[in-house]
């Protein structure tokens, strides 16, 4: 139950009864806890239509509200705010209900939706680096949130395995080892099962090939021709390319596993290639495509969005073509309700073109919503893209090692490597996901690793503190689900209990915002606020040594609720909580 929605519906009945539009009855969490728990600001915009002062409207609404079981206090403040304080029993009962529900008050979406999530997107032959974490962590959080809310999710890594960089690699290896059978057009036998290069060598070859092509137009033309021949099915090139893909996927899977990020599909741009001819024929049959200076293009019919080039003058295909073919494939195979791309904001124009063409040509069905989660860049302390101390790109494996080092330095007596791993992951993931995805942010690992402030380790520390209370009372093998039946939250005895209860019941609000806006930072902010509320409760409300047995049980219930909410919230952003720290 989203408490904001519940209160909005309660007030909406009064608005309707008085002849006002229900849409003005929206209730939100109060921006000032000293005046109330929640507030309704609808009287201000309503005044324009009702031709009455907003203060008079607010007073009229409050006068007609009859819900003493929900509200302890309803106050009107200038120029027309309605400040709402919940009744202690309603607050306690709601917290109790959440404690005893599987998803801590969150209800499944109805009807069930099928969502395709496209994220990760590493390129073949390029090791994953710090710049890849945004798509990986944001995409993973979104698939966790969508599944939690009841959606059927299909996640696809969508490898970059079919562009000009493949031709660059082929030409560079040909230059380096021209004797390899892959380059003999007359060879008809079986190709070797072992790759002629390792993934480490591939990572060294690509920068060399890229530099050569950028500095020499003739080399770039060779690479483009090799790419074209690969896409046309030249046997030796396809066999060599298959080696590139296989060894790259093996390496990338290890990187994603280290982040606990997983995919349902491991498809790449190449998998959509077989649909391109069918799709082009469809475009031609329906007069969507036309020739322009030797290339074939499709208009977007959107102001400020240029036409999309589908086939180049030389007959090669563009990234946009492959992305359209991928949408074609997903639409036919999966028939989704929504496809979400988690790709950096520098690709915004590209996706506007692709989405516009896909919708206009009905490559996707009318029910299918296309969304680009356009995230900002990961920058260092200097405001520039994050680099190593030596000025190079920091590989993901090195970043994780550094996070583990920070964790170990702060806990030198911790000998359990799994706990160090959990702290390192919380450091990286929370440090990234606490930021609104649309913004660039400064990646400061030293700051993220602090055990105080808005950090992953602080969340873990707080959750472990709450767990330690339960372990002290019930032993190591306690089970919150079965215990919660005998331990109930009761009316708050002081402000610390009240604020903790109030924070606990806002979990569904955070989940709904994260879900609807593709913004996991709402979950992070919730978890941080919950941690703060619990720590104040912990300091000011004794539990284990309490003589009052009924009060002790009520506070134990609040500890249970905190552990449950914190565990679920942490899992939604890919963080696991240790038993001890």
Swiss-Prot record:
<dbReference type="InterPro" id="IPR035684">
    <property type="entry name" value="ArgRS_core"/>
</dbReference>
<dbReference type="InterPro" id="IPR001412">
    <property type="entry name" value="aa-tRNA-synth_I_CS"/>
</dbReference>
<keyword id="KW-0067">ATP-binding</keyword>
<feature type="short sequence motif" description="'HIGH' region">
    <location>
        <begin position="122"/>
        <end position="132"/>
    </location>
</feature>
<keyword id="KW-0547">Nucleotide-binding</keyword>
<dbReference type="InterPro" id="IPR001278">
    <property type="entry name" value="Arg-tRNA-ligase"/>
</dbReference>
<keyword id="KW-0963">Cytoplasm</keyword>
<dbReference type="Pfam" id="PF05746">
    <property type="entry name" value="DALR_1"/>
</dbReference>
<dbReference type="InterPro" id="IPR008909">
    <property type="entry name" value="DALR_anticod-bd"/>
</dbReference>
<protein>
    <recommendedName>
        <fullName>Arginine--tRNA ligase</fullName>
        <ecNumber>6.1.1.19</ecNumber>
    </recommendedName>
</protein>
<comment type="similarity">
    <text>Belongs to the class-I aminoacyl-tRNA synthetase family.</text>
</comment>
<dbReference type="InterPro" id="IPR005148">
    <property type="entry name" value="Arg-tRNA-synth_N"/>
</dbReference>
<keyword id="KW-0030">Aminoacyl-tRNA synthetase</keyword>
<dbReference type="GO" id="GO:0005524">
    <property type="term" value="F:ATP binding"/>
</dbReference>
<dbReference type="GO" id="GO:0004814">
    <property type="term" value="F:arginine-tRNA ligase activity"/>
</dbReference>
<keyword id="KW-0648">Protein biosynthesis</keyword>
<dbReference type="GO" id="GO:0006420">
    <property type="term" value="P:arginyl-tRNA aminoacylation"/>
</dbReference>
<dbReference type="Pfam" id="PF00750">
    <property type="entry name" value="tRNA-synt_1d"/>
</dbReference>
<comment type="subunit">
    <text>Monomer.</text>
</comment>
<dbReference type="InterPro" id="IPR036695">
    <property type="entry name" value="Arg-tRNA-synth_N_sf"/>
</dbReference>
<keyword id="KW-0436">Ligase</keyword>
<dbReference type="InterPro" id="IPR009080">
    <property type="entry name" value="tRNAsynth_Ia_anticodon-bd"/>
</dbReference>
<dbReference type="GO" id="GO:0005737">
    <property type="term" value="C:cytoplasm"/>
</dbReference>
<dbReference type="InterPro" id="IPR014729">
    <property type="entry name" value="Rossmann-like_a/b/a_fold"/>
</dbReference>
<dbReference type="Pfam" id="PF03485">
    <property type="entry name" value="Arg_tRNA_synt_N"/>
</dbReference>
